[in-house]
A protein has these predicted regions:
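Contiguous interface-forming segments/domains that mediate binding rather than catalysis
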Residues: 3-237
Length: 237
């Protein structure tokens, strides 16, 4: 079961649904880096796939997102940018479902089913390794047809306004960028994309962010500085 099984109906009800969108890659000429060397660099950055994730699974999944027959060569010709996405993938064949607990691979279109707001919030907590926890998450629709998400974050009750039913609230993602400063956490949420509409959210300290970008040559940003999502409403009315 490959990349698009990440979104299959066999997954848990709150998991993302299938959206077959091809991920773009960096266009500039880059010096190829072998698959194994890339993995070694990621491991030095504490990014390691679940033990059940095999090279064959990764190559199959990358093929399904790129349709590149020479899949390993494709990964090597686009060092780190393609392989980084795989740490945010998910597969029901894996006992722990996630390829890792380091990041989330996502796309705004996955919010098309509103239950994905709950799934995304749960995963945003999971990648912080317990530093930020989301509990009692529920969705509701008010009399004006606006959707809301209610939850507790580190025990603090909150309620975020989303959008009218049928519309996607991209500002929902931006809201998470404010939580680390509000909660005085040691790390912050990160953002990366390689030119496509899909992106990866991670969680890092200042030192980890600098080291990640230096070792991979990628331009991973802080979520609050990335300007890829709308600002949330200034009020909840």
């Amino acid at each position: 079961m490959g990349l698009f099984s990440f979104f299959s109906k066999k997954n848990k009800p709150t998991e993302p649904i299938e959206k077959p969108v091809v991920v773009a890659v960096q266009k500039q000429e880059l010096k190829p880096v072998s698959y194994d060397d890339q993995l070694q660099v990621f491991e030095s950055l504490r990014h390691k796939h679940d033990p059940e994730v095999t090279k064959e699974m990764i190559l199959r999944d990358v093929y399904e997102m790129s349709w590149e027959d020479a899949t390993e060569q494709y990964i090597e010709s686009n060092p780190f940018s393609v392989l980084y996405y795989t740490f945010g993938w998910r597969n029901p064949q894996i006992k722990n479902y996630n390829y890792s607990e380091k990041c989330i691979w996502f796309d705004l279109e996955f919010f098309d089913a509103n239950v994905q707001y709950k799934w995304f919030m749960e995963r945003m907590g999971a990648i912080t390794n317990g530093e930020i926890t989301f509990t009692d998450i529920s969705l509701e629709t008010d009399s004006d047809n606006w959707e809301w998400i209610n939850f507790n974050v580190n025990g603090i009750p909150k309620k975020w306004k989303l959008e009218r039913v049928g519309y996607i609230a991209d500002h929902f993602v931006h809201r998470f960028s404010k939580l680390p400063s509000e909660l005085s956490t040691s790390r912050r949420f990160t953002y990366f994309d390689n030119g496509g509409q899909q992106w990866v959210i991670g969680y890092a300290s200042e030192a980890e962010q600098i080291r990640f970008n230096e070792k991979t040559g990628l331009n991973r940003e802080w979520l609050e500085e990335s300007n890829h999502f709308s600002e949330p409403p200034t009020n909840n009315k």
